Design a protein with these regions (language model features):
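Glycine-rich segments within core transmembrane alpha-helices of 12-TM secondary carriers
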Residues: 134-156, 373-381
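Hydrophobic core of transmembrane alpha-helices in multi-pass small-molecule transporters
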Residues: 14, 82, 93-109, 330-345
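Cytoplasmic helix-loop-helix junction between adjacent transmembrane helices
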Residues: 100-142
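Helix-loop junctions on the cytosolic side of multi-pass membrane transporters
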Residues: 171, 178-207, 413-427
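Helix-loop boundary and gating motifs at the non-cytosolic
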Residues: 1-54, 87, 92, 232-280
Length: 444
């Protein structure tokens, strides 16, 4: 039985995220147990962001030329290698090596499957509304994220009999499980994803399908030119920079923050890790609710996706500030979940706005440009917020992050005003589609 486009995308991406986040609830704690401080963690995670940023556009252009499926599988295998390096890392140099390999992996995989999914949907129905499709896909991915973090949080407790020092410790078990899971996902992608040869899609490859370096860099140049010419893309990418920064501040700092709220738990020996898994798993679980709220709110507001995005950004900023000021485990957990709910709600309307501005032939490279913006922000967030947390407190870093994300609602208000001026009240496209969506005019 052949799976549909939606079924294939939902299955592969949800399993991918399940395997990827198995160690996420304890990964920072594992690095700390091997003598790495918060500032050093910010440094190697910042390097990861730099590597992704440098490779994003070339790798996205390469994926458009060589095929999204092939790029995704190669990136998945590099991801496995990166996790092996982390498993064996005991000093900053090794963690920096991990960051380089992981960055190369992320650059290859980012946007590859999403581009395949969007193009396949639009081939079936060019007028399809992408927001509910992306929200549904996001919900399936969040199920994988939630289950993966819960399982990863439970594994150290189940293997608490292992020594607290060495390669295979309780905190390292989720990483080992993740390596196996990612290998399975790469194999599934190879079997389930069906893609036309890039030459058939682009009509630009030579008879043997060989890639020419000049073509790749020409594709990159077109993407850069598109961003320079489009004020709407620049505003959307600016928000991606901010989200990248605050997400880095959240992911790098939440484990030590919540570990201090678990008095008496020997985390290095596996104590309290299930609670951390519940914290992170629950955050992804409420993200499903965020997708539902985004879809309902978009409908209620006439598919004004820019306005919906602005509302979620302000709410997310407030959640970060209150989280920073909280001091009790249950209250902090609820507020942490709220940051994920609002960020999940923001994602699909933001992505819908972005995809309106992009044409099929450059979709992967433009998604790479979007990812580049996010990781450029992540570099700043990792280094700056990590250093600020070590010099002051994690709470101070999160207050700064909250103020920044709330301020990022302004670009959406500008976009919403442009949309309302550009479309007559009775124009059916005023409910959310780009004014030039039907013809492709004005898209990049």
């Amino acid at each position: 039985m052949r799976l549909t486009t939606r079924q294939t995308y939902y299955l592969v991406t949800s399993l991918n995220w399940f395997g990827a986040v198995l160690p996420m609830a304890v990964m920072i704690l594992l690095a700390q147990s091997r003598g790495v401080g918060l500032a050093e963690i910010g440094l190697f995670m910042g390097l990861y962001s730099i590597v992704v940023a440098v490779l994003e556009l070339p790798s996205g252009a390469l994926a458009d030329k060589m095929g999204r499926k092939r790029a995704y599988i190669i990136g998945g295998l590099l991801n496995v290698l990166a996790r092996v390096v982390f498993l064996l890392a005991f000093d900053l140099t090794a963690f920096l090596a991990f960051a380089v390999v992981l960055g190369a992996s992320r650059a290859l995989t980012s946007g590859a499957l999403e581009a395949w999914f969007i193009d396949a949907l639009q081939a079936e129905d060019p007028a399809t509304d992408l927001q509910p499709e992306l929200a549904a896909a996001g919900s399936y991915q969040l199920v994988g994220l939630a289950l993966g973090t819960l399982a990863g949080g439970a594994l150290p407790t189940l293997f608490s009999f292992l020594p607290a020092e060495g390669v295979l410790t309780p905190l390292a078990v989720p990483l080992v499980a993740s390596i196996g899971a990612q290998l399975v996902v790469a194999a599934l992608a190879g079997v389930l994803i069906r893609e036309e040869r890039p030459s058939a899609v682009a009509g630009a490859a030579d008879e043997q399908g060989d890639l020419r370096l000049a073509e790749v860099f020409s594709h990159v140049g077109q993407a850069v030119s598109a961003v320079v010419k489009s004020s709407r893309l620049r505003l959307l990418l600016l928000v991606d920079v901010v989200i990248g920064a605050i997400l880095a501040g959240s992911e790098n700092l939440w484990q030590p923050f919540f570990a201090t709220l678990l008095p008496g738990a020997d985390v290095a020996a596996g104590g309290g890790t299930l609670a951390l898994g519940v914290v992170l798993g629950g955050s992804f679980g409420v993200g499903i609710l965020g997708n539902f709220v985004a879809t309902q709110l978009s409908r209620a507001l006439g598919k004004r996706h820019a306005l919906v995005s602005a509302i979620f950004q302000v709410a997310q900023g407030a959640a970060f500030v209150f989280l920073a000021l909280s001091g009790r485990f249950l209250l902090a957990t609820a507020l942490f979940w709220l940051t994920y709910l609002t960020r999940s709600g923001w994602s699909s309307p933001h992505s819908s706005l972005f995809h309106r501005e992009v044409t099929t032939d450059k979709r992967t490279v433009m998604l790479s440009a979007q990812s580049l913006a996010g990781f450029a922000g992540a570099f700043v967030g990792s280094v700056a917020l990590g250093a600020l947390a070590e010099a002051t407190s994690i709470g101070t870093s999160w207050i700064v992050a909250g103020a920044a994300v709330a301020a990022s609602a302004l670009p959406y208000l500008i976009l919403d005003a442009q949309d309302r001026r550009a479309r007559p009240a009775k124009d059916p496209e005023a409910t959310g589609a780009s004014p030039d969506l039907a013809t492709g005019a004005g898209r990049v």
